[in-house]
């Protein structure tokens, strides 16, 4: 179970959360967490495992707000909180993606989503975030590109590659393509092929 201690005169209040959640942090007094199991509340639609959810822990009657929900093509990987944003990494058709959810300090439960223009055919991982600012660091790498460190800044949001490991081979004449295979039960399976570009 999960307990919350806020402005409650030193007392704990138990939150009615599922048994299996992954707490990501607090932003503007709102608790952010991902679900590791389906969450069914009385009189409400079930929220599937793999969703990212925000909840006001001060209000016992507050309803959860879904920030990210998985579907047939998208899977949540991770999320982290800065001062005013939530950094979310996810897979979209097996390609790494990242987006920023901006929280307005003057409009409760209002989020603005910005998908970051990172390289395609890559994996994307959160390295670190700063809760005293809106800065975050992402690691991006692919079959042909060595690990890169990207800074997600504080405006719009700013995005800048600030470091890259020296390449171990010349990738100029190579290319990566994504293909689909179908299993006997009809499941679509993505795979990548590295081949000469000419």
Per-segment meaning from a language model:
Residues 47, 61-63, 95:
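Catalytic core of nucleotide-sugar-dependent glycosyltransferases
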Residues 55, 60-68, 73-75:
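C-terminal, non-catalytic "cap/extension" segments appended to globular domains
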Residues 1-35, 66, 70, 77-81, ...:
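Non-catalytic accessory segments flanking enzyme active sites
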Residues 43-44, 59-61, 106-110, 186:
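Short, solvent-exposed loop/turn segments that connect beta-strands within catalytic domains
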Residues 33-47:
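Short, conserved, GDST-rich strand-edge loop motifs in beta-rich repeat architectures
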């Amino acid at each position: 179970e999960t307990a919350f201690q806020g402005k409650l005169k030193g007392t704990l209040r138990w939150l009615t959360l599922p048994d299996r959640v992954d707490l990501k942090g607090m932003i503007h007094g709102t608790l952010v967490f991902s679900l590791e199991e389906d969450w069914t509340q009385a009189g409400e639609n079930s929220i599937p495992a793999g969703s990212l959810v925000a909840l006001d822990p001060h209000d016992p009657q507050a309803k959860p707000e879904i920030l990210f929900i998985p579907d047939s093509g998208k899977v949540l990987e991770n999320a982290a909180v800065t001062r005013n944003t939530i950094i979310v990494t996810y897979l979209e058709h097996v390609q790494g993606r990242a987006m920023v959810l901006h929280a307005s300090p003057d409009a409760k439960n209002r989020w603005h989503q910005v998908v970051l223009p990172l390289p395609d055919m890559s994996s994307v991982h959160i390295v670190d975030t700063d809760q005293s600012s809106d800065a975050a660091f992402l690691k991006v790498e692919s079959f042909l590109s060595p690990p890169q460190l990207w800074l997600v800044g504080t405006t719009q949001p700013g995005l800048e590659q600030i470091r890259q490991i020296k390449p171990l081979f010349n990738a100029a004449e190579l290319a990566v393509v994504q293909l689909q295979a179908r299993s006997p039960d009809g499941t679509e399976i993505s795979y990548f092929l590295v081949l000469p570009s000419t």
